[in-house]
Amino acid sequence: MSKLSRKQQTQKRHRRLRRHLTGTSDRPRLAVFRSNNHIYAQVIDDDAQSTLCSASTVDKELRAGLEANGGSCDASVAVGELVAKRAIAKGIQSVVFDRGGNLYHGRIKALADAAREAGLQF
């Protein structure tokens, strides 16, 4: 029996999680994607199949303020605060957290904690 690669394990975990996570207009889904150099967060209404707001380390607003590259915990904290600020500005108070198959640790945990500190509930 062959072992799964780390990426395949993440994809398998993500498929398993997505069976139970859906975002509605009342409580949209906060989806997180993590690459080696950047982190992306979107607030998604799955019923309407639309992205309500997003933030990432690629945003010009954040890029100027980041000292390191986008693959650090500090960058994740900044993205979490920004996505929470944008969601609250659109009237979204509560979300369902979708960690995207990643383990709840490190940059994913930093983003989630920052979003909670900024006022999002999940």
Curated annotation (Swiss-Prot):
UniProt xrefs under CDD domains: Ribosomal_L18_L5e
Entry keyword set:
Ribonucleoprotein, Ribosomal protein, RNA-binding, rRNA-binding
| Annotated region described as Disordered, given as residue ranges | 1-26
| Entry's Gene Ontology cellular component terms | cytosolic large ribosomal subunit
The record's section on InterPro entries has:
Ribosomal_uL18_bac-type, Ribosomal_uL18_bac/euk
GO BP: translation
Q: Where are the compositionally biased (Basic residues) regions? A: 1-21
GO MF terms here are: 5S rRNA binding; structural constituent of ribosome
Among its keywords, does the record have Ribonucleoprotein? yes
TM spans (from-to): none
The record's annotation in PANTHER family points to: 39S RIBOSOMAL PROTEIN L18, MITOCHONDRIAL, LARGE RIBOSOMAL SUBUNIT PROTEIN UL18M
State whether it acts alone or in a complex, and with which partners, per the record.
Part of the 50S ribosomal subunit; part of the 5S rRNA/L5/L18/L25 subcomplex. Contacts the 5S and 23S rRNAs.
Function of the protein: This is one of the proteins that bind and probably mediate the attachment of the 5S RNA into the large ribosomal subunit, where it forms part of the central protuberance.
Family named by the database record: Belongs to the universal ribosomal protein uL18 family.
Name of the featured protein: Large ribosomal subunit protein uL18
